[in-house]
Amino acid sequence: MAKAKFERNKPHVNVGTIGHVDHGKTTLTAAIATVAAKTFGGEAKDYAAIDSAPEEKARGITINTSHIEYDTADRHYAHVDCPGHADYVKNMITGAAQMDGAILVVSATDGPMPQTREHILLSRQVGVPYIMVFMNKCDMVDDEELLELVEMEVRELLSDYDFPGDDTPIIKGSALEALNGKDGKYGEPAVIELLNTLDTYIPEPERDIDKPFLMPIEDVFSISGRGTVVTGRVESGIVKVGDEIEIVGIRDTQKTTCTGVEMFRKLLDEGRAGENCGVLLRGTKREDVQRGQVLAKPGSITPHTKFDAEVYVLSKEEGGRHTPFLNGYRPQFYFRTTDVTGAISLQEGTEMVMPGDNVEMSVELIHPIAMDKGLRFAIREGGRTVGAGVVANVKD
């Protein structure tokens, strides 16, 4: 059978289901796949296939995640669903499955529960830009007022974490009815409304190529008669010959100009997001640049030593520490291409952090690193990964 060609004619958007255990995330995921296939074409996935989430590794951490794809009239969606709460925490912190928007599933019979709050907080910390809500199991609630009460609670909770609670779309339905092909208001029509809302409420994400140029430096070479070449994979944007660029991180920021781009020993006029290339720098000495710095569009990113982070600490079974760590712990923080030592301050009331925990912390590095909110990092001790984190907030 010929392999189906991947059609790039529709915008691609990454989404996922979040919410408390047993509120119906996986049933909704199956219902979305089924209804989308029926309405817009494509193949349906059944509940069992989604629930038996395969293990994957991201930054040395084992995560169970299900990935499904579906189409709407205007877009192609990649959708992640995790079986367990710990998998969500790991997934969101490592960025294994980045989300352009999330569907928060809340059971109408329970209302918001502890993990509902925790997933909203995590979304805020790791930079999930949009959340919309599917109020599930509405077929099991007879009282209209109860539904309104749950809706109010959810809106308040979203507002508590700086999401626009009052303006968030909340769709009432029953994932099970939709999955079973029922066409009452809580069945298939509710899921079709959800799909239409995904299309309208979650904006098309900015593609990497349209963002400002950034390339983490992996290696530095000196080529006699030509100058200094740095190599790396372009993370975002485009660099063209003649562009002014900055070298950011570890030392004071320096300005330079790109005088050449090469890939596989061929000279090019530009390097684009996703490409591995060498960039020739005008007037820059080999000893002025090092691995761990980044090349960037001037003014687009700044170096910082202090930041707040959301961190997942590996369990002993995952190869992490066997013992807790305390305030003032000084591991290495691995950003992009290099390790930098930093000291950890825990939040008031947190004495220590156990392997397997997720925790908010403040960090002070010994060298500045080019960073923005949302940058992922690993925490290492003597070369082994003991944690994964994301910058939640840059200080100075």
Curated annotation (Swiss-Prot):
Function recorded in the entry: GTP hydrolase that promotes the GTP-dependent binding of aminoacyl-tRNA to the A-site of ribosomes during protein biosynthesis.
Give a Pfam family name. Answer: GTP_EFTU_D3
Give the top-rank taxon of the lineage listed in the UniProt record for this protein: Bacteria
Q: Which GO terms describe its cellular component?
A: cytosol
- The entry marks the following residues as binding Mg(2+), namely 26
Region feature (G4): 136-139
- Every copy of the tr-type G domain together lies at 10-206
Where are the residues of the annotated region G3?
Answer: 81-84
Q: Which PROSITE patterns match?
A: G_TR_1, G_TR_2
Tell me the residue numbers annotated for binding GTP. 19-26, 81-85, 136-139
Q: What class of enzyme is it?
A: hydrolase
Q: Which organism is it from?
A: Psychrobacter sp. (strain PRwf-1)
Q: How does it assemble?
A: Monomer.
* Name under which the protein is recorded: Elongation factor Tu 2
Looking up CDD domains in the UniProt record yields: EF_Tu, EFTU_II, EFTU_III
- Alphabetical UniProt keywords: Cytoplasm, Elongation factor, GTP-binding, Hydrolase, Magnesium, Metal-binding, Nucleotide-binding, Protein biosynthesis
Q: Quote the subcellular location field of this record.
A: Cytoplasm
